[in-house]
Amino acid sequence: MNNTKSTIKIIFFGDIVGKPGRIAVRDFLAEHSDKYDFVVANIENASHGFGLTEKNYNDFIEYGIDAMTCGNHIWDKKDIYSYIDNADRLVRPINYPKNVRGTGSRIIEKNGIKIGVINSIGRVFMGLADSQWDIVRDEILKIKKITPVVIMDF
């Protein structure tokens, strides 16, 4: 990617589940990562089918994943609490209450291009999630002051 490029090739992996999912993504990116400018993955079930360990988070970075999104299962592995505040590629649902650790959006710069990433979760059977519509709209407007490129995982 460079500042004169008019298109950005983004690949987004849906819910990566357990070791088979991690291996599939690792092997795919080892062969095809040069075809994409930015790689996003939903990783909330990547560690043994539930949650995300810090080791697997770091493995995904090594595989070439630029941004990671998640949902309610991110909390299934308790070690998430020891690293989520420093996990600069991880985006938890933005419509969780403000006191929930982690961040619901971030801007990630790669090769001179700033890309906004927002994550949201639905409310059905998700007790602590706030309505996402106003929150997401406001966040998109905030990010668009910095970059026109915004990826939304819902």
Model-flagged regions — what are they?
Residues 1-154:
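Acidic, metal/ion-coordinating pockets
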